[in-house]
């Protein structure tokens, strides 16, 4: 990972790494060498809930310990987030409060299915309960004096729409402003689509050729009509 970051560091203004935070020492060493990288730690609830979902007995404590150490060393770009589902929705506001106390960013996502994770059975069953927990979070965010948190409130309002199968509030810019590259060089709009949508492969094409190709335009059309 260090070698990859070292190369990207030369070319990118911002690098953010998502992790479960389990290997604290490795993450700290990485941040010491690259002080401007962002770290986002995925925590799926309070201790019991997180450990059950993640299948790691000490997962919450390890992730939380990593967060605290990064704060103590005054790392400038730290945050955490959770993917909300029936099992952890009740912990949503508690985790937000925890992030607030530590002065961190708090990101949310909703449970979903994807070809990339070979999963098609992720379903939120108690939608009213989960929606209410999102509503509680929205009210908390709107109490803040931070405009960024007001925008996060709007985003979370959009997640309520999403879990009820309604039209998304914000347009998706995947394949237009952002993209996903898998380890084999395939460039895709994201890793959250139902089927694999490949714009091209960097081992076989130059970036300009790939990005401006007919195949890429076909994928963008798929994104325009994506209901996810």
Role assignments for model-derived ranges:
Residues 21, 57-61, 213:
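Conserved phosphate-coordination/catalytic loops
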Residues 1:
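Glycine/alanine-rich phosphate-binding loops at beta-alpha junctions
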Residues 5-7, 11-14, 33-178, 182-188, ...:
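Radical SAM enzyme [4Fe-4S]-AdoMet core and its adjacent flexible, acidic
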Residues 18, 87, 154, 202, ...:
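Residue-level signal for short amphipathic helical patches enriched in basic/charged
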Residues 169, 184-228:
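Flexible mid-to-C-terminal extensions adjoining Fe-S/redox cofactors in radical SAM and related proteins
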Residues 27:
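His/Asp/Glu-rich metal-coordinating catalytic cores
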């Amino acid at each position: 990972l260090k070698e990859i970051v070292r190369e990207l560091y030369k070319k990118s203004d911002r690098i953010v790494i998502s992790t479960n935070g389990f290997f604290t020492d490795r993450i700290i060493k990485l941040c010491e060498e690259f002080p401007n990288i962002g770290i986002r730690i995925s925590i799926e609830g309070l201790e019991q809930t997180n450990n059950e979902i993640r299948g790691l007995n000490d997962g919450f404590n390890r992730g939380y310990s990593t967060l605290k150490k990064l704060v103590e060393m005054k790392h400038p770009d730290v945050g955490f987030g959770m993917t909300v589902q029936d099992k952890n929705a009740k912990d949503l506001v508690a985790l937000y409060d925890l992030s607030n106390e530590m002065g961190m960013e708090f990101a949310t996502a909703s449970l979903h299915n994807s070809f990339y994770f070979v999963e098609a059975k992720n379903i939120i069953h108690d939608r009213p309960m989960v929606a209410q927990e999102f509503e509680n979070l929205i009210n908390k965010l709107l109490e803040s004096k931070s405009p960024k948190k007001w925008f996060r409130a709007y985003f979370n309002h959009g997640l309520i729409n999403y879990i009820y199968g309604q039209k998304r509030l914000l347009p998706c810019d995947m394949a237009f402003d952002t993209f996903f590259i898998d380890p084999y060089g395939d460039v895709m709009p994201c890793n959250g689509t139902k089927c694999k949508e490949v714009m091209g492969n960097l081992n076989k094409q130059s970036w300009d050729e790939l990005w401006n190709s007919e195949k890429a335009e076909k994928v963008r059309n798929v994104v325009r009509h994506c209901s996810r």
